[in-house]
Swiss-Prot record:
Its main location: cytoplasm. Belongs to the class-II aminoacyl-tRNA synthetase family. Type 1 subfamily. L-aspartate binds at residues 175, 221, 456, 497. InterPro entries: Aa-tRNA-synt_II, aa-tRNA-synth_II, aa-tRNA-synth_II/BPL/LPL, Asp-tRNA-ligase_1, Asp-tRNA-ligase_1_N, Asp/Asn-tRNA-synth_IIb, AspRS_core, GAD-like_sf. This is Aspartate--tRNA(Asp/Asn) ligase. Keywords: Aminoacyl-tRNA synthetase, ATP-binding, Cytoplasm, Ligase, Nucleotide-binding, Protein biosynthesis. It comes from the Bacteria. Aspartyl-tRNA synthetase with relaxed tRNA specificity since it is able to aspartylate not only its cognate tRNA(Asp) but also tRNA(Asn). Reaction proceeds in two steps: L-aspartate is first activated by ATP to form Asp-AMP and then transferred to the acceptor end of tRNA(Asp/Asn). Its EC number is 6.1.1.23.
């Protein structure tokens, strides 16, 4: 017999009744029923009920056992007595009649229980993550993570991609976030950087003659944490392809992403053909470039209606005269809601920094809905009818209005759309709604610095190429850039690359970077462009966010092995920690710490 086990705690069934077995695992739960001890023994594979009678020679030791002790149990497999079976457990029709117990590892008093679903403070969970990971839900999430990554790898290889590993120690580059820097001992005063993404390396692979690249890539960004972004590091399915168009990327990647959601989505419907939504349309209709399409509400622009001479609502007209816009957010069936519903939404809008949300309630008949509410009196019947048509309203609906400069109005309208959909129970559940967002702007205006900045990835190909860069207003240029959104989350982003050196230099020049800056910051890739660069493009999908959606959780810590807390601290390992004087001396570093506040 094996030293520790002949079966796992998830193996045994009625077919093994009357066999001798040996199991090893953790004491998940111990119960005393009329002097008979029941031990639920748990390992990675499942739980098996073990029974210790008072006349068993193992009973004296069994009485001393406590939760999470690691034990080896020998015994006889037998069917559970009629009426005591547990069909919820794979092993629920058998139990082990215990003949011998060996303690393999005692456990100190637990800072948090493993049994049960009681939530504990995050600092306790992270400090004792090894205990937290024993809990069933988190344990399953981590196993799901491995399975999803295996599936993504398999699907990428089926699409003809080859897996590569790019360097972890690299040069610092301005990719939108702070770098994690690594000081060089050999080269005093110089630093490596951990890659924010393998962007340059994967493009260099295409220039090196490889055709279809992917990797499950660790990425490092020194940025503030939030629920859908872990501090420090994250993983992405990184992809690049040569001699392709945007449509080729879509054709290759849509089956991979869709397939993963179908395989691990517990039967929830998944969008079969991802619709393509231009960025400008997404911002207008949904107030977001990562729209949640489970919500049926569609925002409409009604600026021209409020700008009419016969409309006397000056609060909006004054904003419109300064270049503002008015967005209408429909609220299907909201006419029957109490006044508190509308007041609560108005208070919420004010808490978001807005002046509020104007609204109109439509009553009467579908043929002739009549508007009521605080601003209805300022709107002639003709304007009300136009709003009904444009916002796709009917009697019994209401409509809210967001008025501000376009960027702020879109953001408020988008947030209001989500809130209204949730409050009214309009959004679908149990479904994965995916879409492509396309035609992103190449550049955006930085109001603080009064400069033109890259809108997203600086390496994207402008639509129209070099000619567009030379002749168009930069703020009108669109890029061959695209995202995948799912249920309100951005889960992938990519683009066709600007592979011509003269176009790349011009693109950076518009954003305020001279050729010398391009050479300094992207020297390796810029040199490679001089020696025959193929047309290429790709994308990166957020592995962590995909798994978070599949697991049905709201926080990335629930699908990550050893995450940091909100302060970017690893409470288990004690990182970050102080370096020794010897370590600092070897790295030629002297500390200059800020004064304590």
């Amino acid at each position: 017999m094996h030293r520790y086990r002949t079966h796992t705690c998830g193996d045994l069934r009625e077919a093994q009744a009357d066999e001798t077995t040996r199991l090893s695992g953790w004491c998940h739960r111990i119960r005393d029923h009329g002097g008979v001890l029941f031990i639920d023994l748990r390992d990675h594979y499942g739980i098996t009920q073990c029974v210790v009678d008072p006349d068993s020679k193992a009973f004296p030791l069994a009485e001393k056992l406590r939760s999470e002790w690691v034990v080896r149990i020998d015994g006889l497999v037998r069917k559970r007595p009629s009426g005591t079976e547990n069909p919820e457990m794979p092993t629920g029709f058998i139990e082990i009649y215990v003949t011998e117990i060996e303690v393999l590892g005692a456990a100190a008093e637990l800072p948090m229980p493993v049994f049960g679903d009681i939530d504990y403070p995050e600092d306790i969970r992270l400090k004792y993550r090894f205990l937290d990971l024993r809990r069933e839900k988190l344990h399953k999430n981590i196993m799901l993570r491995g399975q999803v990554i295996d599936s993504l790898r398999r699907r990428m290889k089926e699409q003809g991609f080859f897996e590569f590993q790019t360097p972890i120690l690299t040069a610092s580059s301005p990719e939108g976030a702070r770098d994690f820097l690594v000081p060089s001992r050999i080269h005093a005063g110089k630093f490596y950087a951990l890659p924010q993404a393998p962007q340059q390396y994967k493009q260099l692979l295409m220039m090196a003659g490889f055709d279809r690249y992917f990797q499950i890539a660790p990425c490092f960004r020194d940025e503030d944490p939030r629920a859908d972004r872990l501090p420090g590091e994250f993983y992405q399915l990184d992809v690049e392809m040569s001699f392709i168009t945007q449509e080729d990327v879509f054709a290759a990647m849509e089956p991979v992403i869709r397939g993963a959601f179908e395989e691990f989505g517990n039967g929830q419907p998944v969008t079969q053909t991802f619709p393509r939504i231009p960025y400008a349309e997404a911002m207008l209709k949904y107030g977001s470039d990562k729209p949640d399409l489970r919500n049926p509400l569609v925002i409409a622009d009604v600026t021209d209606l409020f700008a009419r001479d016969d409309v006397s609502f000056n609060a909006f007209k004054n904003v419109i005269k300064k270049g503002g816009v008015v967005r209408a957010i429909p609220a299907t069936g909201a006419a029957s809601q109490p006044r508190s519903f509308f007041d609560k939404l108005n208070d919420w809008a004010k808490s978001e920094g807005a002046a509020g949300l104007g609204y109109v309630i439509f009553e009467g008949s579908d043929e002739a809905p009549v508007g009521k509410g605080p601003i209805a009196k300022f709107l002639p019947a003709e304007v009300q009818a136009a709003i009904v048509t444009r916002a796709d309203l009917k009697a019994g609906d209401a409509v809210f209005f967001a008025c501000d400069i376009e960027e702020k109005a879109a953001k408020l309208a988008g947030a209001a759309r989500l809130r209204i959909g949730h409050e009214l129970g309009l959004s679908k559940t149990g479904v994965f709604e995916l879409c492509w967002i396309v035609d992103f702007p190449m550049y955006e205006w930085n109001e603080d610095d009064k400069t033109v900045d890259f809108s997203h990835n600086p390496f994207s190909m402008p639509q129209g190429g070099l000619e567009a860069l030379q002749t168009q207003d930069p703020l009108t240029i669109k890029a061959f850039q695209y995202d995948i959104a799912c249920n309100g989350y951005e889960i992938a982003s990519g683009g066709i690359r600007n592979h011509r050196p003269e176009a790349m230099v011009k693109a950076f020049e518009i954003a305020g970077y001279g050729e010398e800056t391009v050479v300094e910051r992207f020297g390796g890739m810029y040199r490679a462009f001089q020696y025959g660069a193929p047309p290429h493009g790709g994308m990166a999908a957020g592995v962590d966010r995909i798994i978070m959606l599949l697991a049905g959780v709201q926080n990335l810590r629930e699908i990550s092995l050893f995450p940091m807390n909100q302060k970017a601290e690893d409470l288990l390992m004690g990182a970050p920690s102080e370096a020794t004087t010897k370590q600092l001396r070897e790295l030629h570093i002297r500390l200059n710490l800020p004064e304590p506040k």
